[in-house]
């Protein structure tokens, strides 16, 4: 195993992540540069859908990444897809998640604390904070190093990896 030669102290140092030590990344995604899509990602395990797989502060992912998103009222993200399942699990506040088809038909799902949605691979989805308070929620994806999200909007899709140039 990869930890065979490590002491318990070394394992604890590398495989424990604390909220206070995770820096919020306000440029984790290309669409986060746009008003209405601003949000911060705190990476605990891996990089999630940000594509920032070189983040040495996060615990190395094996089977899945885990991050915490912070979203102010009125903000969210652009409709997008992944090649793997994505889960939003609300910790604090309220979040409106959505799924939509290729024609733009959308279903909104209001989630509160301790509620979640699992978005299947290839299904267009996203979220917005329509409440008056910030929301914190956990995000997990179904592969250790998923590809950068694919945006439904062609104008966002083309530069979807530009944010990685400054990473």
Residue ranges and their predicted role:
Residues 77-80, 97-99, 119, 125-131:
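Short beta-strand His + acidic residue motifs that chelate non-heme Fe in jelly-roll/DSBH
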Residues 1-62, 155-167:
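A short, N-terminal "cap"/entry segment at the start of jelly-roll beta-barrel domains
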Residues 101-121:
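Short acidic-glycine-tyrosine-enriched beta hairpin
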Residues 63, 68-73, 81-101, 140-143:
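Short, conserved beta-strand element in jelly-roll/cupin
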Residues 57, 102-106, 133:
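Short, solvent-exposed loop/turn segments that connect beta-strands within catalytic domains
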Residues 1, 10, 124-167:
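Double-stranded beta-helix
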Residues 47-54, 65-82, 121:
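Conserved short histidine dyad/triad with adjacent acidic residue
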Residues 66, 76, 85, 106, ...:
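A structural connector/turn signal
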């Amino acid at each position: 195993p990869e930890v065979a030669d490590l002491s318990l102290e070394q394992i604890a140092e590398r495989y424990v992540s604390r909220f206070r030590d995770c820096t919020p990344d306000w440029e984790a995604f290309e669409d986060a540069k746009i008003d209405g899509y601003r949000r911060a990602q705190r990476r605990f395990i891996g990089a999630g859908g940000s594509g920032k797989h070189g983040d040495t502060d996060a615990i190395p992912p094996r089977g899945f990444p885990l991050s915490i998103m912070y979203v102010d009222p009125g903000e969210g993200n652009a409709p997008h897809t992944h090649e793997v399942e994505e889960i939003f699990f609300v910790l604090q506040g309220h979040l409106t998640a959505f799924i939509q088809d290729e024609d733009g038909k959308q279903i909104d799902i209001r989630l509160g604390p301790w509620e979640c949605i699992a978005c299947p691979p290839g299904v267009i989805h996203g979220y917005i904070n329509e409440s008056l308070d910030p929301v914190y929620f956990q995000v997990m994806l179904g592969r250790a190093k998923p590809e950068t999200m694919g945006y439904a909007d062609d104008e966002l899709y083309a530069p979807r990896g530009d944010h990685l140039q400054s990473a």
